[in-house]
């Protein structure tokens, strides 16, 4: 369009407009869109100046409008002619941001001349905007009949074009009741048989909109096209709904009468098996029901017709309390005792929905009161649950004998109306029922009395009324089918006020069939207020056991109620083991109840809780070990408590931290028992070994554990390891001296004579050095003998585990080869065997020396890294082997004239050497090429290029990448590996060291001064290279200010809650004294905040009571609505 405007405004293409004067452009302030008005009076230059004025057009750029849209909307035909002259047809159909063309704008503004002009110029009338509206649909919506006529007369207009939701212009005409437009469309060939996406025809739309004139035209035109009025008026949509159904939904009595006069079938049912009569009955449209019933000429009983739920018209009227309609239906013969698919009569349905006018009407008409639904409930069961209960019935009905007999009638669960009233918490209904001398001892099939229901749901006022006139405590202490008394049920659901009332009335602390007391139930739910009421009444009940030996502490810990556990501990509840040898702390740990464990740790009775366990239990071990396995974060908190900082300033020289180690190891008296009891093995450093077993690196790195290991290391670990290292050096150093001082390849003995082996001449050892060499040989021999003895002892100690450690096999190789190397002291052996064993021995001696250095932190980490990288190399051996075979054999075929590749074995070895970078390109490839010795030069060099790419580049980089990744992984877990070795070392040492020595050096705690040096200069220098590094640790701040403030706010809220409850009780007493009737008098719902979750969980359980609760709480209002057409 913009290109068309530019063509219009070009000087060479400008056309003269005769007799027209352009007078400028003004803004129409009355128009909501501030559209332009352009008056053309002949001055073409001023028109050009207006179009070039971008400032005035800028405010329409958001909608992407052009001048032609506004000209069409204003009916400026001359300006439109000027704009489109010289333009293409595309300019006529240009769209704004909403998909509207100039023709849409003209139709919307009822500009007939603009529509005519645009159509004459070739505008497309069938284009639809974003709302699927064509210009014809817009004209129909605006009831612009002239525009409709112009559009329909145009040959290109599709009269049956579908718009929004599949509606044609004919459907929209019926919705507007525009009979003139309908006549125009029908004459131009609009189809009456075309439906929208819901299957509605124009006759449906006319019926729903109450368009009587359009309905008449549609039926008349249908007769002309071969459809009778009766057949046409009974067309159905996708839901099988006829026009009569839609007319009833709209509530237009005249339209309904017109449908009936045209032959609409009253008994026609839609998909939900509902007649139009059921819709009318639901709405309470008495006049419509009367009209339809009086118009029905069929043979069936239309008054008692049922829908898909087997509900009659009277059921529908009863559900929504349509009193007049129900009275009329009864008068014309409606069955007042018919039942629906759930066995509900109109009386039961009206009672469930609190339609009291209908209830009283049905009772006055003699409705049967003994009819029960499929749950066995009569209307009285439902009446007592409603607000004001029996007060809603007329007094004369309550005097009827057959109604009085219903008070003891039971449903399928054996519950009487009194059970229902007590469960719902309706004190007024309870009072009314008790006036009929109803027995409060009546039981349901699960042996529950009304008091059980009232106590279970916290109905305090109901409980007070039931217990008001009792003379004994039999009702209080009766158990149900599971042996649960009202006290059990009230405690189970956390109703502390009910529990207090029952205890005051004489309820006993009995156990149910599972051995659970009221305290067990309250602790399982975590109801601390209820527990406090019980404990204040009977303190000894804390130690009552159920059939499995569980106390209330076990229940609270299993469910994770930390506050309940804290309360029971504060009331000095005994810490006992159940039949599975588990204390409450074991149960909390196994179920990962973090808050319970933390609460127990902070308790004053923590040490007592820790000591309750059996040493021979396989699944319930020491709680510290269980804590490390299941809840390491709690163990961290416990270790934090073992760090006790001093009160001095942290920068002071006297500032110190005391580290307590009592939770990290069993007492020495238990680990060093001469005769183990009950086959229990007490190992040293038990807790640290469990940490290593479960990879608890965060615990092993805790300051307390580090100080504990440092204490062990300084006490005996460092000395023992240095002694072990020194004894190993007694064989390593002499062996090294022998290898260095003696020329390889010569056989020697104790006399210093050298036998000729490889050399062709004889040589002699310097006689001055023969004695030192003899001493070295003896030391190597003795160290090997000592090593043999040590390994044999280890075999008996470690048994099968000895053979699983590859270090032991390495030491056997060292001692054997070194002994063979020095065996010429006693025997003559060949020199080649002697020196081969010597090479093996010296190699493994120094390699094993690296493993000894793993114990030291600074150098041990690098040795661990070397070990892991070597394992990575072994994992990639498969790739090496195949590449070695591939290239080695290939080079053997191509280069077998060279000595290095003359045999397959030598070729493989040379290829392995080339893998390390020793390719020897000049001697092996280049010079043979110049001497024409290569039989296949192209293939040979191609193989060399492939080898270079695969091995030195790709494979080596792959190994480097794996090594780097493994190094990062080792660095991540290096601390765990190092500490694991330290723990293993100290564990093995403590097993071997005597008890008197351990008792002397072992410490229960240690005090560290962070601001003072811990060792002398020489010792610090030595520790820097070999020993564990010291890192300064800060003692954690356990009690933060934020926690204290939250605790203060918590107690303040409790005080406010208590004050409000007292004021509430006082106001209730004032109301009773002044005899004020309150709307809340009938409410009996005292649900505290702490038991709200428990109540919601009970309501979510599947029960037959759910239907009753839903019917009482909400009134279902079925709104019959029809989709927009």
Curated annotation (Swiss-Prot):
Residues the record lists as binding Ca(2+): 791, 794, 808, 811
PTM statement from Swiss-Prot or TrEMBL: TRPA1 activation by electrophiles occurs though covalent modification of specific cysteine residues in the N-terminal cytoplasmic domain. Hydroxylation is required for TRPA1 activity inhibition in normoxia. In hypoxia, the decrease in oxygen concentration diminishes the activity of the hydroxylase EGLN1, thus relieving TRPA1 from inhibition and ultimately leading to channel activation.
Transmembrane segments: 722-742, 768-788, 807-827, 833-853, 877-897, 938-959
Effect the entry attributes to changing residue 918 to A: Ca(2+) permeability is greatly reduced
Cytoplasmic side: 1-721, 789-806, 854-876, 960-1125
Binding site for (E)-cinnamaldehyde: 415, 422, 622, 642, 666, 712
Membrane topology listed for this record: Multi-pass membrane protein
Presence of the UniProt keyword Ion transport in the record: yes
Reported effect, residue 918 to E: Ca(2+) permeability is greatly increased
Site positions (Important residue for activation by the scorpion wasabi receptor toxin): 635, 647
Coiled-coil regions listed in the entry: 1044-1073
Record-level GO BP terms: calcium ion transmembrane import into cytosol; calcium ion transmembrane transport; calcium ion transport; cell surface receptor signaling pathway; cellular response to caffeine; cellular response to carbon dioxide; cellular response to cold; cellular response to food
Glycosylation site positions: 749, 755
Location of this chain's protein in the cell: Cell membrane
Disulfide bonds: 193-666, 463-666, 609-622, 622-666, 634-859
GO molecular function, one term: metal ion binding
Tissue: Specifically expressed in a subset of nociceptive neurons. Expressed in dorsal root ganglia.
Family recorded in the similarity comment: Belongs to the transient receptor (TC 1.A.4) family.
Stated name of the protein: Transient receptor potential cation channel subfamily A member 1
Organism: Rattus norvegicus (Rat)
Biological classification of the source: Eukaryota, Metazoa, Chordata, Craniata, Vertebrata
Gene: Trpa1
